[in-house]
Amino acid sequence: MNKFDVVVVGGGHAGCEAAAAAARIGVKVALITLKPENLGEMPCNPAIGGRGKGHIVKEVDALDGLIGYIADQAGIHYKMLNHTKGPAVWGPRAQIDRALYKSAMYSTIMNYPNLTTIFASVEDIKVIANKVTAVIVNGKEIYCQKVILTTGTFLSGVIHRGKEQIKAGRLGENASYGLSNTLSELGLRLGRLKTGTPPRIDSRTIDYSKLEEQPGDLIPTPFSEITKKVLVPQIKCYITRTNEITHKIIKENLHLSAMYSGQIQGTGPRYCPSIEDKIIRFSHNASHQIFLEPEGLNSNTIYPNGISTSLPSDVQENMIRTIEGLENCKIIAYGYAIEYDYVDPRQLKRSLEVKSVDGLYLAGQINGTTGYEEAAGQGIMAGINAALAVKKQDPFILDRTDAYIGVMIDDLTNGIDEPYRMFTSRSEYRLSIRADNADQRLTPKAIDLGCVSQLRKEVFQKKLSKLNTLRDYVQSLTITPKQLQNCGYQISQNGIARTAFSLLGLPNFGINIVKDIYPELNRYDNNLLLLLTYESKYHAYLERQKEDIVLFKQEETYQIPQDLNYDQIPSLSIEVREKLKQSQPETIRAAKHINGVTPSAIMAIIIFLKTKYLNSSITDKK
């Protein structure tokens, strides 16, 4: 076979999602990756999800993507992060068995309808009159209408460990230099980014008696709506910390770190700093937390999350053995930093197609993101849009009000200057685009596109029907304050009747109390009642948020006084303050387009200015 509608280059998280999504739309797809074992590879931490990231996993699943369902076949330690806060910012996360994940992904991709997998290296892309026509594999052309590049860290990748430099996309795998040259020749602006990984440790050499246990959730919450129950055995993780001796060794050897010797020019991820960065940027901290994460049920390898490093191997040995519980540990593989090319994502349409090259799409780390989840979110969008373009249909665009995927793509196409990672704080609409309602928001859109399986469609429609029926029912149940008092529950004695739906969202009520008042609710699915609880809890806030959105859009053009002291705005993060002070934007619109200045930060500035200049317009303040 040498002719396809869509060719996907790379078999990581972005590539697998892109290929599967395009295939679901019904076009002929080829996924080209170097080796079978590359499919679904997790080269960094053995975990999926988290704050913001977990939302993307749920959204990809809602579009009938792979990452959530595959993760549920390999999840060995589930944890709902931020559970003490509101449901809008809960972050579903799971430790993943690498071998199980890769096996499940391989089986899925190799048996996917409309999808052919080719194990080879793509040497070049053929472009005629600014239009993709083929990819070059082993000197031969494979013709196609659309190409999706999901190259990860392979574009001109260089591994750094101390003074050692190795040309590689990952340890032991060759980098791609031809594609970097091709992209440059096409006139695309490339930049250089960096990420890193910690040393891996033999679990049999760790003294767990000295460590703090970190159990997972008693009842795992699956990522996928298709998953009825997590069947994989669950295990514990452990926590330890660096100490002053650890920091002393690192400081004494900073000149040997590739990051601090000037050897690496690429920008590293702000939110996943190396241990060298941590002890410099946070020198006031006496220690830093390390999560010891198992890489699998049958693996002796531990991933020490929190100490990625580019220090020489001997320094890594000395450093790690100062840490409690790791005094006699054996290092299986040493940590390293990797530097790679990325394409400035401002050159992309929101469909993830390159503006200047018809039919060329980019997804994943090539766009400057970091993380499996961000890659998967871009991959599924690129795959859907490439397939729609083949069918000459309009692109599928998610905006900031639709999904975290929409927030991410909007942020990327407005420009970034450091590896991009998703957080809930990046969304000004996070109360409405929650993890729990991802399917309600996106699965109907996916059904309309024709990119969901019959199983997904049936599962969703059955759930939605039950949810709507239950919502109508709890909204029909009413009770007066006096009747509530007779049941033993106090509420404002204003004579106004409440519905069971409104009671679900009250701080001192919730499911159990409402069930006590209405025992007939015990026959309904508790998970559906939970969804209605979240809806009720945020109902009033969502109404107010509509006003915030109007205010936000109206006040984008307001001018900012040049003497404004950003330190006086307490809700701004240190990062945001630094960027505002550096850029000194003249208007709210200018501030909005500074990378890293979140929509919630913009709202905080507007409210601060409104308060400070309460009796006059802020538009003329200088």
UniProtKB/Swiss-Prot annotation:
UniProt keyword annotations, A-Z: Cytoplasm, FAD, Flavoprotein, NAD, tRNA processing
One Pfam family here: SAM_GIDA_C
Residues given in the record as FAD binding sites: G10, G11, G12, H13, A14, G15, V122, S176, Q365
Protein origin, superkingdom: Bacteria
Segment forming the signal sequence: none
GO (cellular component) term, any one: cytosol
Residues annotated for NAD(+) binding in this entry: 268-282
Disulfide bonds: none
GO biological process: tRNA methylation; tRNA wobble uridine modification
InterPro entries: FAD/NAD-bd_sf, GIDA_C_N, MnmG, MnmG-rel, MnmG-rel_CS, MnmG_C, MnmG_C_subdom, MnmG_C_subdom_sf
Cofactor: FAD
Single Gene Ontology MF annotation: flavin adenine dinucleotide binding
Compartments where located: Cytoplasm
Methyltransferase among keywords: no
Subunit relationships: Homodimer. Heterotetramer of two MnmE and two MnmG subunits.
Role summary: NAD-binding protein involved in the addition of a carboxymethylaminomethyl (cmnm) group at the wobble position (U34) of certain tRNAs, forming tRNA-cmnm(5)s(2)U34.
Family per similarity comment: Belongs to the MnmG family.
Protein's name according to its UniProt entry: tRNA uridine 5-carboxymethylaminomethyl modification enzyme MnmG
Taxonomic source organism: Orientia tsutsugamushi (strain Ikeda)
